[in-house]
Amino acid sequence: MDRIIGIDLGTTNSCVSILENGNVKVIENAEGTRTTPSIIAYANDGEILVGQSAKRQAVTNPHNTLYAVKRLIGRKFEEDVVQKDIQMVPYKIVKADNGDAWVEVNGQKMAPPQISAEILKKMKKTAEDYLGEAVTEAVITVPAYFNDSQRQATKDAGRIASVDVKRIINEPTAAALAYGMDKAKGDHTVIVYDLGGGTFDVSVIEIAEVDGEHQFEVLATNGDTFLGGEDFDIRLIDYFVHEFKKESGMNLKGDPLAMQRLKEAAEKAKIELSSSTQTEVNLPYITADATGPKHLVVKISRSKLESLVEDLVQRTIAPCEMALKDAGIDRSKINDVILVGGQTRMPLVQKLVTEFFGKEARKDVNPDEAVAMGAAIQGAVLAGDVKDVLLLDVSPLTLGIEAMGGVMTALIKKTPRFLPRNPSVLTADDNQENAVAIHVLQGERKQAGQNKSLGKFDLAEIPPAPRGVPQIEVTFDIDANGILHVGAKDKATGKQQSIVIKANSGLSEEEIQQMVRDAEVNSEEDRKFEELASARNQGDALVHSTRKMIADAGDKVTAEQKTAVEAALVALEAAIKGDDKAAIEAKVEELSKVSAPIAQKMYAEQAENPEAAAKPAEENAKADDVVDAEFEEVKDHK
C-alpha cells in the first residue's frame, strides 16, 4: 500500500505529517515552516497563491484573498452564522443555485470544497517534496461536531485535489492519538479541549492498554462549529474600528483594504498579548479624508482583550459540561487535559480550563501540530505500518428518521460509538399507499422539522395497505468516515432500497468532476509556469556571466565577436521578458554558441598564465576592502 499522509485541514492554519521509522514527522513546507496559513489568493493574471505567499499580498488584494473558508463548508447561505461572516470578511460570500454558501472571485462562483482543495494540494506537494515520491492517499481531520454535510464536503475537497481520502477522523480524536502514542502509559481518561481558528470541540477519550494494544475509545464529544480564533479576531477588529471612529469620526467598515489591515493587526496583537500585558497597534495611512491621511494608533492591554472575549471563552464551558454528562463521568476522574488549537495559547483560556477541570492542562503537546500527527498515526494504521492501535469513535449528533406525526425517531444516539446496522420499523402514514417516504434527519430535537434534513428516498412498489399496516425496516450504517448509509426493506415482500446519504447541500457529481478537471488544468499551468521561471532564471544567469566575461576580456575580444555577442544578449533579454519558454531556450543556446569561442580563448590563456589570471582576483579583493567611510566612537571619560 502507498504511504498515507495525515492532514490537519484547519480554519487558520493547515499541517501535514507522516509516520517514519516509528516516529511522526511534521513536514516543513517550501517556506520552511511546519504550519501553512489556510489562505488562498487569486491573482489578476490567473495565478493561485496558497499559504504565506497569499497572506503577504492580502492587503493589496482583499476581495480575492480567501481565509476561514472552512467556516462555510457544508453551510447554507441563509444560516445566521454565514450572514454574520458576510459582514466581517472583505471577500464576497454568495448564494449558490443549491442554496449553499459559496464565494465569488473575479466574477466566478466557487464552492468551499473547491477552495479547500487548493490547500490540500499544497499539503500534498509539501509531503511529495519531502518524501521524493508521489502521494495519493491521506487521512484528513475535521471538527468532531461536523455534521454529515460538512464531512462529505471535506471528502469532495480531497477528490478535487486528487487525494484519495482513506479516512475522515475527528480532530480531538487525532490529538488523543498523538498524545496516547507518545505520552500516555497505562489506562487514562483524557479531555481534549480543541479551540481552533474557526471551530471548538471537546471530547472525552479513554485510552487503555489491552494485551499490548493501545485502545482509544471516544466516550463523548460536543462543540460549536462556529466558535474559534476568528471570532476573537472579530472582537478586536470591532474594538479598533470603534476607537478609530471615536477619534476621527470615520467608519472603517466600508473600506475592504483597511479591514484587511485591521484583520492582520488584530491577529498579531492577540498573539502578542499571550506573552505580554500590553501592545500597541500602529497602522499609518489607514484611510484619508479631505483634511488628509489618517493614522490608527491604539494601545490595548491583555485585560482589555480578555474583557472583549470573555463571553466567547465562557461559551466553551457548556459543551464541556455536556460532554462529561454524555460520557457519564465526573470531572474529578479526568487524568489529563490536552489543549489543541492555537487559540488555547491565550492565558484566559488556559485559566478557565484549569478552573473548570481542576487541573493544569498539559503543555508538552504542541497545539498546532498534534492533530496532523494523530492523522498520520491513523494513516499508518490503515497502511498496516502500525498494528497495536484500535480507534473507537462516536457519532457527533443523533441520527434518525421522521415518523408519523412529524416526530423524529432516533436510530443512532449521539453518545454511543458508531453502531452499524441498528434497525427500526416504520409504517405508512396514509391508506393504500404503494410507496413509503424515508426522511433521514440529524439533530437533537424531537420535532422532525427542527432537525437537519440529510436526505429523502422512497421505498416504492409495495402492496397498498391500510395506514399502519406496512412494516418497513430501516437500517442505518455509519462507515469509518462518519458517512451515513441508509437501507429500507418491506418485511412483507422483501423489497429493498438503499442510499448513501451525501450532503444535500453539497456538490453534484458533475460539479465535482468539473472541479477535478479544472484542478488538473491549473496543475498543468503551474508546471508550465515553473518551467518558464526556470528558463528565465537560466537566461538571466547566462546574461550576467556573459557580460562579466566580455568586461574581463577587454581588448582580447574582436569587434566582430563583441557585436555578435551583444546582439545575442539583446535577443535573449527580450525573450526573457516574454512568456515563450522555447524562445528563451533558443536564445540561450544562441548566446552560448556565439560566446563559446571567447570563453575557450580566455580559459586557454588562464591555463598558460595562472599568475596573470590571479591579478584580477586580487584587485577585486582589494576593492572589497574599500569602505565608504570610517567612524570611531569617542567616549567622553569623566
Curated annotation (Swiss-Prot):
One of the Pfam families matching this protein, by short name: HSP70
Segments of skewed composition (Low complexity): 605-615
Modified residues (Phosphothreonine): T199
Keyword Iron assigned: no
Record's keyword annotation contains Phosphoprotein: yes
Superkingdom, natural source: Bacteria
Family matches, as CDD domains: ASKHA_NBD_HSP70_DnaK-like
Stimuli inducing this protein: By stress conditions e.g. heat shock.
Function: Acts as a chaperone.
Protein name listed in UniProt: Chaperone protein DnaK
The organism of origin for this protein: Pseudomonas savastanoi pv. glycinea (Pseudomonas syringae pv. glycinea)
Record gene name: dnaK
